[in-house]
């Protein structure tokens, strides 16, 4: 596309230098003086946080924010999502290396807002009813999480476009629910012997099923990023 696309939380890869700096909250709780000295997110739309810790509820260390759209937690010690209700309009939640995360308890409070959920390297985490209540989810990544019995739960997400489960094992091996889903157009996983489809086959079938790309691209020199055009 020739038109200039405004960078926001919907893009697969966010170019932070194209966002207003005063909308971004960055904090490393191991080096609290590195970026901001307070924990006030009330005016932030984006938050990228490292090493968030709490004895009972890690989120107690952060202020409420109705403006927050994107929250990324790296190496947080959270075990569940209790306390995340203070970000009532959150659209995108990313968790990386949150190795203690074991439960989706508390996540359902975001069911009216959350559209992207990415959980990466939480080997104890397995989705249950709270995650399944997120009816607005469009991108779901459960990479290197706990074993999942089957993919029947995908039918709970009527607007899901992109589903990834790299290094997460689907125990029954049946990947047909990906193809049966009416809106999933992209899937990512590693091939396993007991799966009934290889990645290459799923990718080919989805390409044929959705002939139109339906992506909006942003360019920066030789690089590009995209978001799904679903609005």
PLM features: residue spans?
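N-terminal amphipathic/basic-hydrophobic helices that include classical n-h-c signal peptides
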Residues: 1-4
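Concave beta-strand-loop units of leucine-rich repeat
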Residues: 6-37, 43-58, 67-79, 89-102, ...
